C-alpha cells in the first residue's frame, strides 16, 4: 500500500478483515474496463457497498484512477477507522462515508434523490453464520492435512464483514431487488460472487427485474477463482 499506492497511513484494528490487495485491485481494474466499454470515462462516481474499516476499494480506486467514492457500512466503528484513513491521507475531497442504519437494507436509506453513480461495487459476506465460517476453516485444514482439536477461523473479520442471515445468496438477491428500485441513480451495479452456482439464479432474477444488460467477468488470483456479475437497467 505504501510503496505502490503511495498511501501514508493504513491502520485498523486486528479484529477487522485484512483484505488481500491483488484481488481487490483486480476488481477495480475490471470495473474500469467495464466503464470504458460503456464510454463512461469522465467524472467517475463509485458507490462502495460495505467499505469496511480498511476503506480498501476507495483508496485503490483513487490511487489508480482518481475516482470519487461514497462508501457505506452498517458498522459505526468500521466507518470511524475508514474516516481516519481518509483524513490521514488527505482524501476527504474524493471519498465520503455514509452509515447504513438498517442492516437488512443495502441501498435503501443510503441513496439520495440527487445521487448519480457511474457504478456500484460490492464484496458481499460469504457465510450464513460464524459456524459456517469455522466449518470452512475445518475443510481448509483437512485439505492441508492439518489436524486441530479446536478449530477457529483462520482469517480475521467482524460479524458484519463475514456473515449475513441467509449467506451470500440472500445478500446478493436483496441487492438485486434494491438495485431495481434505484435504477436511475446508478448506471452499472456490480458484485463479486464467490459461488458459481449462484450466477444462473442471478441472471433469471435480473431479467425479471428488467435489467437491459448482464455480464459475468471472470477473476483468477492464484488458485482462487471468482467472478464479478455486472448489470444495468439503462
Region locations from a protein language model:
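Class I SAM-dependent transferase core
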Residues: 1-40
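Conserved class I S-adenosyl-L-methionine
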Residues: 41-52, 70
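Conserved SAM-binding loop of SAM-dependent methyltransferases across substrates and taxa
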Residues: 53-67
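Glycine-rich phosphate/diphosphate-binding loop of Rossmann-like nucleotide-binding domains
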Residues: 66-74
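S-adenosylmethionine
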Residues: 74-76, 88-216
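Conserved SAM-binding loop
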Residues: 82-83
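Short proline/glycine-enriched turn/loop segments at secondary-structure junctions
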Residues: 216-222
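Helix-rich interaction surfaces within compact, conserved domain-sized segments
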Residues: 223-233
Amino acid at each position: 500500500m505504501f510503496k505502490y499506492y503511495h498511501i501514508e497511513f493504513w491502520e485498523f484494528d486486528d479484529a477487522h478483515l485484512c483484505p488481500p490487495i491483488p484481488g481487490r485491485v483486480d476488481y477495480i481494474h475490471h470495473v474500469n474496463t467495464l466503464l470504458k466499454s460503456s464510454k463512461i470515462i469522465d467524472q467517475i462516481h463509485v458507490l462502495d457497498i460495505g467499505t469496511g474499516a480498511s476503506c480498501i476499494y476507495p483508496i485503490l480506486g483513487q490511487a489508480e484512477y482518481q475516482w470519487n467514492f461514497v462508501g457505506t457500512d452498517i458498522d459505526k466503528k468500521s466507518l470511524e477507522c475508514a474516516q481516519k484513513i481518509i483524513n490521514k491521507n488527505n482524501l476527504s475531497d474524493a471519498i465520503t462515508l455514509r452509515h447504513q442504519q438498517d442492516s437488512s437494507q443495502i441501498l435503501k436509506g443510503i441513496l439520495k434523490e440527487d445521487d448519480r453513480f457511474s457504478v456500484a461495487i460490492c464484496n458481499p459476506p460469504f457465510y450464513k453464520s460464524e459456524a459456517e465460517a469455522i466449518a470452512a476453516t475445518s475443510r481448509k485444514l483437512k485439505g492441508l492435512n492439518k489436524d486441530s482439536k479446536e478449530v477457529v477461523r483462520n482469517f480475521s473479520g467482524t460479524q458484519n464483514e463475514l456473515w449475513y442471515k441467509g449467506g451470500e445468496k440472500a445478500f446478493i438477491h436483496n441487492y438485486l431487488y434494491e438495485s431495481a428500485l434505484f435504477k436511475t441513480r446508478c448506471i452499472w451495479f456490480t458484485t463479486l460472487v464467490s459461488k458459481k452456482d449462484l450466477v444462473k439464479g442471478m441472471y433469471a432474477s435480473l431479467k425479471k427485474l428488467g435489467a437491459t444488460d448482464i455480464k459475468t467477468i471472470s477473476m483468477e488470483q492464484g488458485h482462487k477463482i471468482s467472478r464479478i456479475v455486472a448489470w444495468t437497467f439503462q
